[in-house]
């Protein structure tokens, strides 16, 4: 059976990450989302195609489907549709309006509408990585506990501590004396420096988080610079799930830990503090000592 990623016009909601790139170009685990979708379809036994018939599977390109759901769709073979709770067809075989069988998404399958959906996909993908690969240089005074993929030309300096599943791209300088943990991916040409902690985050290419900073449960775009002492808060005092503005509405993210979403070319002044769930649009900046309580639009 063939599978076709069907082009859609996704509703706004994944900004500011998608202000400067298409949704399928967003880097998760240092791979474009569209490539991860294609790999998942192939692994489920589908042949990729750009055209298909009523016997083939069509998947929205802004939908993320679990391996289990893809297996179910492949076994059904005949007319069927996968609809979410809002009635949106995420995938279908034949005419979705006349499908004989309707499936319901599991917890790992959903329409990608908001930045926190991208974090959820990133966590799923990182959890499947079992083997590390070292193509750069690791100081004997660095510690790696977990799975590390380190790209060519990258260096882990003394005092670096890595745990969990971490991907670091090519030509990065990591350290000295920093802590990287959780499901974290760091793009090519990044600098993570002295006394910095990165936890469960996506850091895109050419970004610098040089010193005395914390970045947790966040998505940071490319060519971003953290001024010294920049802190992304990610936990509510009452322990409830975070809410974040999207499309003019305050939405529950479903996440107890949720940091900051930054677009490309953002610069923070020294000692900037960011409330959880706040978003900074591309090319915005903060002054030294700023407290970011609301989204910053360009």
Feature annotation, model-predicted:
Residues 194-195, 200-298:
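Glycine-rich hexapeptide-repeat left-handed beta-helix
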Residues 9-11, 60, 86, 153, ...:
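Residue-level recognition of short loop/turn positions
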Residues 35, 155, 173-175, 225, ...:
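Short, surface-exposed helix/turn micro-motifs that flank interaction/cofactor sites
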Residues 22-25, 106, 142, 160, ...:
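Conserved short-loop catalytic and cofactor-binding motifs
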Residues 150-203, 207, 214, 218:
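Acidic, glycine-rich loop-and-beta core segments that form the ion-binding/anion-interacting portion
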Residues 1-137, 283, 289:
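Terminal amphipathic alpha-helical/low-complexity segments used for targeting or macromolecular assembly
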Residues 124-147, 152-158, 164:
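A charged, amphipathic alpha-helical module
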């Amino acid at each position: 059976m063939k599978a076709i990623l069907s082009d859609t016009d996704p509703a706004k909601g994944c900004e500011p990450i998608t202000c400067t790139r298409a949704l399928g170009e967003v880097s998760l685990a240092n791979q474009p989302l569209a490539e991860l979708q294609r790999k998942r379809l192939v692994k489920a036994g589908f042949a990729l195609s750009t055209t298909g018939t009523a016997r083939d599977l069509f998947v929205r390109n802004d939908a993320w489907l679990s391996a289990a759901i893809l297996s179910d769709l492949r076994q059904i073979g005949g007319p069927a549709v996968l609809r979410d709770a809002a009635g949106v067809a995420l995938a279908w075989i034949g005419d979705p309006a006349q499908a004989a069988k309707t499936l319901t998404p599991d917890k790992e399958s959903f329409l990608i509408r908001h930045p926190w959906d991208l974090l959820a996909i990133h966590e799923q993908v990182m959890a499947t990585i079992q083997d590390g690969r070292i193509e750069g240089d690791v100081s004997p005074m660095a510690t790696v506990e977990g799975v590390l993929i380190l790209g060519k030309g990258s260096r882990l300096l003394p005092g670096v501590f890595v745990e969990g599943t971490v991907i670091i791209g090519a030509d990065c300088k990591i350290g000295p004396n920093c802590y990287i943990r959780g499901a974290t991916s760091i793009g090519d040409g990044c600098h993570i420096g002295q006394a910095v902690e990165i936890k469960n985050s996506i850091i895109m290419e050419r970004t610098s988080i040089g010193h005395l900073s914390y970045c947790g449960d966040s998505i940071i775009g490319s060519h971003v610079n953290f001024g010294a002492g920049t802190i992304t808060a990610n936990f509510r005092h009452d322990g409830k799930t975070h809410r974040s503005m999207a499309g003019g509405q305050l939405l529950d993210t479903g996440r107890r830990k949720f940091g900051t979403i930054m677009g490309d070319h953002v610069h923070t002044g020294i000692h900037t503090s960011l409330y959880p769930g706040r978003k900074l649009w591309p090319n915005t900046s903060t002054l030294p000592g700023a407290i970011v309580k609301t989204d910053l639009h360009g």
